[in-house]
């Protein structure tokens, strides 16, 4: 039941954003974007933060890490997120040298384009959420120059490697509870 509410909030947020700035205009804004995605060669260590923790913990404490994963998924549990929530990615891009990976409930090309415009270097797509749309989303993200990771339950990653996915984030049972208790922790990706 909660998943239905989360998806409804996601769709409301997406409709609001697309109403304010069309897909075409968002695409045209790339010509003014100072932040091209950087190549993610190999990730040694990552810090996992929520948007609120970017200011509160990451930037104030001047944390040094190879990669920052900003997880926006929790925002949809509360309601439809603000159209300005992704601006934290641009703030992070301006003030930290770490690579930025955007984790969200990606369901459309608009969201991937928006992530690029805001300054992320890569995205984490949810295999379970996208199902048969995963291939198209991976291909579009690659065309934009974003590095692609996939969140999955499956122990075999062969099908993801064939799509050009850089790495996986394994879903671990009860990981949501751990994130809520302490969402500022080291996380290692499995590169494939």
Model feature map: region roles:
Residues 92, 96-98, 105-110, 117-118, ...:
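Eukaryote-skewed repeat-based solenoidal scaffolds used as protein-protein interaction platforms
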Residues 83-86, 131, 135:
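Non-membrane alpha-helical structural segments and their capping/turn regions in soluble enzymes
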Residues 107-119, 154-166, 182-192:
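Catalytic cores of alpha/beta
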Residues 43, 97-100, 104, 124, ...:
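Short, Lys/Arg-enriched charge-dense amphipathic segments
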Residues 78-81, 103-104, 126-127, 149-152, ...:
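Glycine- and other small-residue-rich loops at beta-strand/loop junctions that grip anionic moieties
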Residues 98, 136-151, 183-189:
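Short acidic, glycine/proline-enriched helix-loop-strand junctions
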Residues 69-74, 114-134, 167-178, 191-192:
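Glycine-rich phosphate-binding active-site loops on the catalytic face of alpha/beta enzymes
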Residues 1-100, 109-110, 144-150, 154-166, ...:
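Conserved N-terminal beta1-alpha1 strand-loop-helix module at the mouth
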